[in-house]
């Protein structure tokens, strides 16, 4: 690495803390077994009536993931959700996730109707990167290429030169660095720092963070590893450096699931949103998954390893949005057209450069492969 990380401090917007509280207040109660079965049957009928397909993120509750799989929908990372929706015949997509995912789906499928169970379901990375402040920051550094993570608003994407996911962010930054480009990175400081450390690129880092991953604690993880010495540690790169440093595998949602499936290990400590455990248990039955610690035993946490905005998606509001057709995502046509450019640039790069990674099942051997791939 030829240069230390350079960063610019920005406070989170005033509404963020309130938004967290409001999100937890809006998390729906779990329905009874009888109501759950009735809601699922109702939703199946409404999906058929509306000729709609359900796309869900790995971080939403298990019952929504199950329903998406059972009805021919998709459970995936954020970019694959949008790709699936773009390529599916359905003209109505119901996105169970957070708002930037709905916006990305609309950008890639501008002529389709995009619905969400709750339009208030947002993301701390999105909230922490308001377009006016970010645009001013970019204007102050006109000599830099602007690279933004998928977890941003359509307006922020429209200000960017490149959009990336963790599947290809490292490769794109490495390519830009090799061409002598200097970079503005937004919004996640931990993922940006990880990529900067790997590539040595000249990067100015926006100081955003994921509410969930930012709370994982390196000291507490070290203590947990002592309790489970044979467990392999799976870490999403949005986590702090002290957590990433202890990982056996650093990767995205999809890649962490694959690592759990393909490894010969039987115990895993998982440092990402606990919603992913549903798919991990399906992919690797009989294996044990332990949540990485977000705080000490007597401490409180804002997320406790589960995104409050993801938790706002439930069976009741899913049925309601299909019944009423409200909560539709709209993206200004000009913004959507401009935001698609950095997305297409990433997809074109992936088509030219991406190679399939074959895993051996040996974590010690595969760690180098997993550390550079996967989507958010």
From Swiss-Prot:
Keywords for the protein's UniProt record, in alphabetical order: 4Fe-4S, Cytoplasm, Iron, Iron-sulfur, Metal-binding, Pyridine nucleotide biosynthesis, Transferase
A molecular function (GO) term: quinolinate synthetase A activity
UniProt subcellular location: Cytoplasm
EC number per UniProt: 2.5.1.72
Catalyzed chemical reaction(s): iminosuccinate + dihydroxyacetone phosphate = quinolinate + phosphate + 2 H2O + H(+)
Positions that bind [4Fe-4S] cluster: 123, 210, 307
Cofactors: [4Fe-4S] cluster
Main location: cytoplasm
Pathway(s) it belongs to: Cofactor biosynthesis; NAD(+) biosynthesis; quinolinate from iminoaspartate: step 1/1
UniProt cofactor note: Binds 1 [4Fe-4S] cluster per subunit.
One Pfam entry name: NadA
InterPro entries: NadA, NadA_sf, Quinolinate_synth_A_type1
A Gene Ontology BP annotation from the UniProt entry: 'de novo' NAD biosynthetic process from L-aspartate
Xref: PANTHER family: QUINOLINATE SYNTHASE, CHLOROPLASTIC (PTHR30573:SF0), QUINOLINATE SYNTHETASE A (PTHR30573)
Stored NCBIfam families: nadA, PRK09375.1-1, PRK09375.1-2
Protein family according to the UniProt entry: Belongs to the quinolinate synthase family. Type 1 subfamily.
Protein name as annotated: Quinolinate synthase
């Amino acid at each position: 690495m030829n240069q230390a990380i350079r960063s610019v401090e920005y406070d989170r917007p005033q509404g963020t803390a309130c938004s967290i509280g409001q999100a937890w207040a809006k998390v729906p109660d779990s329905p009874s077994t009888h109501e759950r079965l009735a809601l699922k049957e109702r939703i199946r009928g409404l999906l058929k009536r509306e000729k709609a397909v359900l796309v869900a993120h790995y971080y939403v509750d298990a019952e929504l993931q199950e329903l998406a799989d059972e009805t021919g929908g998709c459970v995936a990372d954020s970019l694959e959700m949008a790709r699936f929706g773009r390529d599916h015949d359905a003209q109505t997509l119901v996105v169970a996730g957070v708002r930037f995912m709905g916006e990305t789906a609309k950008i890639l499928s501008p002529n389709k109707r995009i619905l969400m169970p709750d339009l208030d379901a947002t993301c701390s990375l999105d909230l922490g990167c308001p377009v006016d402040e970010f645009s001013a920051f970019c204007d102050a550094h006109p000599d830099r290429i602007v690279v933004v993570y998928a977890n941003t608003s359509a307006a922020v994407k429209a200000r960017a030169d490149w959009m990336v996911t963790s599947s290809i962010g490292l490769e794109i930054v490495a390519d830009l660095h090799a061409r002598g480009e200097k970079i503005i990175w937004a919004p996640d400081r931990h993922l940006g720092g990880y990529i900067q450390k790997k590539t040595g690129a000249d990067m100015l880092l926006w100081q955003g963070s994921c509410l969930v991953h930012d709370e994982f604690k390196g000291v507490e993880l070290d203590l947990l590893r002592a309790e489970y010495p044979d467990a392999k540690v799976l870490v999403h790169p949005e986590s702090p450096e002290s957590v990433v440093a202890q990982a056996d595998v650093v990767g995205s949602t999809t890649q962490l699931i694959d690592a759990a499936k393909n490894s010969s290990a039987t115990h895993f400590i998982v440092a990402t949103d606990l919603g992913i455990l549903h798919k991990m248990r399906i992919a690797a039955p009989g294996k044990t998954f332990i949540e990485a610690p977000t705080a000490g035993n007597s401490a409180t946490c804002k997320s406790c390893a589960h995104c409050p905005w993801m938790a706002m998606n439930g069976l009741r509001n899913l049925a309601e949005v299909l019944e009423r057709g409200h909560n539709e995502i709209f993206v200004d046509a000009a913004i959507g057209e401009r935001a698609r450019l950095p997305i297409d640039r990433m997809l074109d790069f992936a088509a030219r450069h991406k190679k399939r990674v074959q895993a051996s099942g040996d974590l010690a051997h595969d760690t180098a492969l997993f550390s550079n791939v996967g989507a958010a």
